[in-house]
UniProtKB/Swiss-Prot annotation:
It is found in: Cytoplasm. InterPro entries: aa-tRNA-synt_IIb (IPR002314), aa-tRNA-synth_II (IPR006195), aa-tRNA-synth_II/BPL/LPL (IPR045864), Anticodon-bd (IPR004154), Anticodon-bd_dom_sf (IPR036621), Pro-tRNA-ligase_IIa (IPR002316), Pro-tRNA-synth_IIa_bac-type (IPR004500), Pro-tRNA_synthetase (IPR050062). This is Proline--tRNA ligase. The gene is proS. One of its GO terms (cellular component) is cytosol. Pfam families: HGTP_anticodon, tRNA-synt_2b. GO terms for molecular function: ATP binding; proline-tRNA ligase activity. Keywords: Aminoacyl-tRNA synthetase, ATP-binding, Cytoplasm, Ligase, Nucleotide-binding, Protein biosynthesis. It comes from Afipia carboxidovorans (strain ATCC 49405 / DSM 1227 / KCTC 32145 / OM5) (Oligotropha carboxidovorans). Its EC number is 6.1.1.15. It is an enzyme of class 6 (ligase). It comes from the Bacteria.
Amino acid sequence: MRLTRYFLPILKETPKEAEIASHRLMLRAGMLRQEAAGIYAWLPLGFRVLKKIERIVREEQNRAGAIELLMPTLQLADLWRESGRYDAYGPEMLRIADRHKRELLYGPTNEEMITEIFRSYVKSYRNLPLNLYHIQWKFRDEQRPRFGVMRGREFLMKDAYSFDLDEAAARLSYNKMFVAYLRTFARMGLKAIPMRAETGPIGGDLSHEFIVLAETGESGVFCNKDVLDLPVPGEDVDYDSDLTPIIKQWTELYAATEDVHDAARYETEVPAEKRVNTRGIEVGQIFYFGTKYSDSMKALVVGPDGVEKPVHSGSYGVGVSRLVGAIIEACHDENGIKWPEAVAPFTVAILNLKQGASDTDAACEKLYRALTANGVDVLYDDTDQRPGGKFATADLIGIPWQILIGPKGLAEGKVEIKCRADGSRELMSPEDALARFGAKA
């Protein structure tokens, strides 16, 4: 993509309403625009990151055996009355009515609707286990939306829902999602720690929040620092095998949110030098809630003994849009964002340091065409901005690799590659630069 043809509304000044780094940088980098309190338009650069994150989430859900569908944003109020949550959910739920006075709501979550879909089609244990997921926009009418996408009113979520014959089988489904979440966040360059958590309005008696440690987080957390060094399962993980050893490794060390923190146990189990008491950002949460919804909504299947019984369920959420902010909170410096390569809007930025000069124009054009032809996401800064301005823009928007092309280097047959993550620089030939990114001239 040529920057002269791209829509990238960079802000020179930091908006006054931005309180934390991710909000400031997303606004300054032209990633989003606030349209109302807690409601944002995703501009092209931000939308590219959102789609990269969504792709990783989808790949790991599919790998774990979940099946994608898509449910509507609007739901019937009567479904929520069946479960008993319509009145209990509170003012965060946006309640609306259509022209026929039918009561609807803008879904903050989807347990009722997925249970209604399940009970309409699945009648036998032979169709279990089943895990269905979707990625959809949601709305919660937060009393005080703040911190940009970290606590917005409209947000993109991945929700998965598992259905099993009994608790033992449901725990296996829970374990699969536990491992899938470890892999999902690791692929995005995040260290997300699973921590025991409260179940809240979802219900049930088992839940883990996946927390990225950050001083700007809204959750108080307590853990053994050894949990920060645990290995994440690799691509070869077999979801049909016994995942208990992995789960045990991650859950036997103390890690809990402040809502369920046990101070006595913490002091007993965790040596003083290994205690971590900080704040964190919740990027995902998983729940096992048994028959909470299948009981009230009559989601029954016939078991092997011929007797009908309510299914056991769990739900598994990932805050897709919140992850954009969480990654920035974990990956930035005073100059801007430092995107992990897997979620970066572009992999490479080509900076023409003397736009209009025939030699630099030709070299940039050749590299740009070769890289894009080989499937590399490239942003080519072909503007007439001064070099200092180009450096500032590239650092602000956080492209992982910058290729700097100027007349002095070209005279020696060299271009310069800068790594945004650590600031390191290296001179090499244009051909070697192409090879660095798996491309050929």
